Design a protein with these regions (language model features):
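Active-site neighborhood of HAD-like aspartate-dependent phosphohydrolases
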Residues: 1-42
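Helix-loop "lid/cap" segments that line or gate small-molecule binding pockets
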Residues: 25-28, 47-62, 117, 150
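Short, acidic loop-to-helix structural element flanking the phosphoryl-transfer center
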Residues: 78-105, 111-115
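Conserved SAM-binding loop
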Residues: 13, 86, 103-106, 138, ...
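Metal-dependent phosphoesterase signature
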Residues: 34, 54-92
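Conserved phosphate-coupling serine/threonine residues in phosphotransfer and NTP-handling enzymes
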Residues: 12, 107-109, 184
């Protein structure tokens, strides 16, 4: 019996991976760092603490990690204020699921980005709890952010369903002992063997209905 549905944000509700990628690339290039071919995929699911350290340590950005994070986040927020890149069908899916279960959100995005995205989408009132990876010890694929969401909602992980798109996100939900519904990221598709561990694999978020969880 699923009592709570915990959504990821980037790639599930908001098509923002390209904006994060663009903003990080700009900071690397403008400060004299060097972008690596595997950088985008390596940072999927990382918390802000982790990816800002990655830009500093691996990509050679000569700024303190806190400043790197603040600079990237401000650029992403500026894009959101111009136009929030919602995944088609995301708002309707959130509203459908809110009629069936309590909702939470567990994201690698920074707190200001989470709050802005949900407010601009006008669904912030539907989520009981939202957790940023910067508020826990470890980012995805560690289970911390999902376990913290369950703790704040006062529910057992066993009655939670996770809605995820990325390999690290799926691993995080599975490690938390939760039911995972995968909507594979079309740009960085999770490996087939990992998708087989999900309770359901959907083509798009339009396919997410309460019946999927029964």
């Amino acid at each position: 019996m699923i009592d709570a549905v915990i959504f990821d944000l980037d790639g599930v509700l908001v098509d923002s991976e390209s904006l994060w990628d663009q903003s990080r690339r700009e900071v690397v290039e403008e400060t004299g760092g060097r972008w690596l071919p595997d950088a985008t995929e390596a940072m999927l699911g990382m918390s802000s603490t982790e990816w800002s350290a990655f830009l500093h340590d691996r990509l050679g950005v000569p700024l303190p990690p806190d400043e790197i994070s603040d600079t990237v986040v401000e650029r992403v927020l500026a894009h959101y204020r111009e136009r929030l890149p919602l995944v088609p069908g995301a708002v309707a899916a959130v509203r459908r699921m809110a009629e069936r279960a309590r909702l939470g959100l567990a994201s690698s995005a920074n707190r200001p980005v989470i709050d802005a995205a949900l407010a601009l989408a006008e669904v912030d009132n539907l989520f009981e709890v939202t957790v940023s990876s910067e508020e826990v010890a470890r980012g995805k694929p560690a289970p911390d952010v999902y376990l913290e969401a369950a703790r704040r909602m006062a529910v057992s992980p066993a009655v939670c369903a996770v809605i995820e798109d990325s390999a690290n996100g799926i691993r995080s939900g599975l490690a938390a002992g939760m039911t995972v519904v995968a909507i594979p990221n079309p740009h960085f598709a999770p490996p087939p063997e990992l998708l087989r561990s999900a309770a359901a694999v959907l083509s798009t978020i339009d396919d997410l209905t309460p019946e999927v969880l029964t």
